[in-house]
Design a protein with these regions (language model features):
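Eukaryotic partner-binding/assembly regions in large regulatory complexes
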Residues: 1-79
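Short alpha-helical segments that sit at the start of domains
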Residues: 9-16, 80-114
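Short acidic, hydrophobic short linear motifs in intrinsically disordered regions
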Residues: 34-44, 109-127
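Short amphipathic alpha-helical interaction segments
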Residues: 48-55, 133-149
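A short, conserved structural fragment
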Residues: 62-69, 148-161
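Accessory beta->alpha helical hairpin/"wing" motif in late/C-terminal subdomains of nucleic-acid enzymes
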Residues: 76, 80, 154-180
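Short acidic, glycine/proline-enriched loop segments that cap or flank alpha-helices
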Residues: 107-115, 131-135, 157
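Short, amphipathic alpha-helical interaction segments positioned at domain boundaries
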Residues: 169-203
Length: 203
């Protein structure tokens, strides 16, 4: 057996409850891309995955995929082949860049909240400044809905067009877009292209 796959045998050592956690973690990573430690309902799942990372690494290597993790951010991410990556339109790509900048700005502030928080109006102002135009209401709603599904943000308002609504910025934002990704996104924006982002779907 390939030495890298030896860890697959560890699945036999899991208890029934642990095996259920294993299946839940796989489903979460494949369907939602990220497991985020700071989300209360995912903390135990995050800890379980880190404890059993060799098993997960071996399992994902069988499908030519990988897990990427940053324990300082508390994020585990599924990285699949190119054909499994999300394709973002121009508004969505701009929004990711805006949220990345807002996340970096906000994380330097002292806060009692688990995640940096901004208002929808904060996002609109930054987005409009970056693009040199005004984001339309329909586009705003679509962008926030899409990126919420991608587990980059959470909108704490039933009305995505409410300027006073709050947006929680997840640590998956910087994790999913590194400096190379930022440069590629900016270049693609200049060419008017869609952009490939982190793997998974937005269910």
């Amino acid at each position: 057996m390939n030495r890298d796959l030896d860890a697959l045998t560890l699945v036999r050592e899991l208890s029934n409850d642990e095996f259920e956690s294993f299946k839940t973690a796989l489903h979460t990573l494949l369907s939602k891309t990220f497991i985020i430690r700071g989300i209360d309902k995912e903390k135990e799942l995050y800890d379980f995955t880190i404890r059993n990372i060799a098993l997960f690494d071996a399992w994902f290597s069988c499908m030519d995929a990988a897990l990427v993790r940053d324990e300082s951010l508390g994020v585990i991410s599924f990285r699949g082949a190119g054909d499994t990556r999300l394709r973002l339109n121009l508004d969505e790509t701009c929004a990711v860049l805006v949220f990345r900048q807002l996340y970096e700005d906000k994380k330097r502030e002292i806060s009692l909240t688990a995640f940096p928080v901004i208002t929808i109006a904060d996002f609109q102002r930054k987005f409009n400044a970056m693009t040199g135009g005004e984001i339309k209401k329909t586009s705003l709603i679509n962008v926030l809905h899409r990126l919420s599904g991608c587990r980059l943000i959470a909108v704490d308002s039933p009305d995505f067009a409410d300027s006073e609504g709050l947006i929680r910025l997840y640590p998956s934002i910087p994790f999913s877009l590194d400096r190379e990704g930022i440069d590629e996104s900016i270049a693609a924006l200049g060419r008017g292209e869609t952009v490939e982002e982190s793997s998974g779907d937005e269910s």
